């Protein structure tokens, strides 16, 4: 975010944030993609 070099406890927080965001965003995007596909594949 901002220029704050006095934060030595930022590495695990950023890693955990990255894991949490991607761990939730990837299945969510896949789920929305499946729902959108189902909307278009109505027989």
From Swiss-Prot:
Keyword list, A-Z: Chloroplast, Electron transport, Heme, Iron, Membrane, Metal-binding, Photosynthesis, Photosystem II, Plastid, Thylakoid, Transmembrane, Transmembrane helix, Transport
GO biological process, one term: photosynthetic electron transport chain
Protein name: Cytochrome b559 subunit beta
Membrane-crossing residue ranges in chain numbering: 18-34
InterPro entries: PSII_cyt_b559_bsu, PSII_cyt_b559_CS, PSII_cyt_b559_N
Homology family: Belongs to the PsbE/PsbF family.
Function comment: This b-type cytochrome is tightly associated with the reaction center of photosystem II (PSII). PSII is a light-driven water:plastoquinone oxidoreductase that uses light energy to abstract electrons from H(2)O, generating O(2) and a proton gradient subsequently used for ATP formation. It consists of a core antenna complex that captures photons, and an electron transfer chain that converts photonic excitation into a charge separation.
GO molecular function, one term: heme binding
UniProt cofactor note: With its partner (PsbE) binds heme. PSII binds additional chlorophylls, carotenoids and specific lipids.
Membrane topology label: Single-pass membrane protein
Subcellular location field: Plastid, Chloroplast thylakoid membrane
Cofactor(s) annotated in UniProt: heme b
One Gene Ontology cellular component: photosystem II reaction center
Chief localization: plastid
Upper lineage: Eukaryota, Rhodophyta, Bangiophyceae, Cyanidiales, Cyanidiaceae
Domain of life the protein comes from: Eukaryota
Sequence positions that bind heme: 22
Subunit note: Heterodimer of an alpha subunit and a beta subunit. PSII is composed of 1 copy each of membrane proteins PsbA, PsbB, PsbC, PsbD, PsbE, PsbF, PsbH, PsbI, PsbJ, PsbK, PsbL, PsbM, PsbT, PsbY, PsbZ, Psb30/Ycf12, at least 3 peripheral proteins of the oxygen-evolving complex and a large number of cofactors. It forms dimeric complexes.
């Amino acid at each position: 975010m901002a220029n704050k070099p006095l934060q030595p406890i930022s590495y695990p927080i950023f890693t955990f944030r990255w894991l949490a965001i991607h761990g939730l965003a990837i299945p969510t995007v896949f789920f929305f993609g499946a729902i959108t596909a189902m909307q278009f594949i109505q027989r």
